[in-house]
Amino acid sequence: GNQDGFWQADADSRASLTRKMGDEAERYDKFFGTLNRLADFALNEDGDRFQPRQSLDYAPGGRNAELLDDARRLGLIQWNNDTDIVFASREAAAYFRGGWLEEYVWYKLRGIRPHDWAVNLKTQSYAAQVENECDAAVVHRNRLLVIECKTSGFGKNEMRDVGYIYKLAQLADQIGGTMSQKLLLSARPIHDNIRQRAKEYRVDILAAHEVRRFVEYIKCWMQG
């Protein structure tokens, strides 16, 4: 629809930033968490007022400052090299809250052209009458891959982390049966104990420096 057209134009305009964040994810590690948190405060889901002005604990330098500089040039934020960041819109805040990783997936899938794919999907389970959200799904030769994108940190709360994995496994099985494949794409590192649990649920993981292997992973799966 038209809405999709607008979204794609926006995603295209910031594709270089999106690509940089995904391909070099391990360089930004904790800064992703910081941006995620500030964007969350700005969007303020409990209240309905958007609060675009947010404060960092310290003025970023080096590669983090470079990232903010790129974002400023793209009109996503206002930033004067200090601790204050002003998100230009709700959409810009949503991008930094994690939307960028979904755009990364969209951007890469568009280049690979599997048979069918969608990002930011709502699925209805007829049995349970429950609507579920799915970050991305790819269908190729009658096989389904369900992708979950995460930009917040893993490792602080194991129960919550395993919960993400369980939910992804459940969702994929509901949509595509037990033969569906599942991928957790994380901008932040994931520890071995969580990877072990993911294996038990047959969930693949690409995290931090592995994110740049996303295209290779998809091509391999398509040939499967």
Where are these regions (language model features)?
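Intrinsically disordered, low-complexity Ser/Thr/Pro/Gly-rich regulatory segments
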Residues: 1-224
